């Protein structure tokens, strides 16, 4: 998401009788001077906007630690976790990632939450992948059909 503008404090706008044409200037960082010459700074006339939400995904890829800087601080990272660590050699051969590698990248990038998916069919019980990832990055979820997450 793009950063949003701050929210106008309607009670202050009404109390100070600020005309509508001045609202956009105030949202953009300006203040207001009353007819009596009293200046009200921007911070008194607005409340901060919610920070923008962010989502990133890494799928069909090997472990790329250099991505950490690009992914830094995202709210939700989807990362493939095709293999368990026991199959790390197979992951490298096929240019895929392990659950631990996905979690390591999430930790390096200081993301808020990690969603792992793109599992190999060899795992009937994907909880082994979840446990491996959570051992490194606790806030990890398994992707499931129909899963809905609020950011």
Question: Where are these predicted regions, by residue range?
Answer:
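Active-site-proximal loop/helix segment associated with metal-binding centers of metalloenzymes
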Residues: 1-57, 61-69, 76
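Binuclear metal-ion centers of metallo-dependent hydrolases, dominated by the metallo-beta-lactamase
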Residues: 63-151
């Amino acid at each position: 998401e793009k950063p949003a503008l701050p929210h106008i404090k309607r009670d202050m706008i009404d109390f100070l009788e600020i005309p509508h044409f001045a609202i956009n200037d105030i949202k953009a960082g300006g203040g207001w001077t009353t007819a009596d010459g009293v200046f009200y700074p921007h911070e008194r006339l607005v409340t901060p906007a919610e920070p923008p939400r962010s989502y990133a995904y890494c799928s069909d890829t090997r472990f790329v630690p250099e991505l950490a800087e690009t992914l830094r601080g995202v709210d939700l990272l989807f990362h493939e976790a095709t293999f368990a660590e026991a199959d790390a050699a197979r992951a490298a051969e096929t240019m895929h990632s392990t659950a631990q590698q996905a979690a390591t990248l999430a930790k390096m990038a200081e993301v808020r939450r990690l969603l792992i998916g793109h599992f190999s069919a060899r795992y009937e019980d994907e909880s082994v992948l979840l446990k491996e990832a959570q051992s490194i990055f606790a806030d990890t979820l398994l992707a499931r059909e129909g899963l809905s997450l609020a950011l």
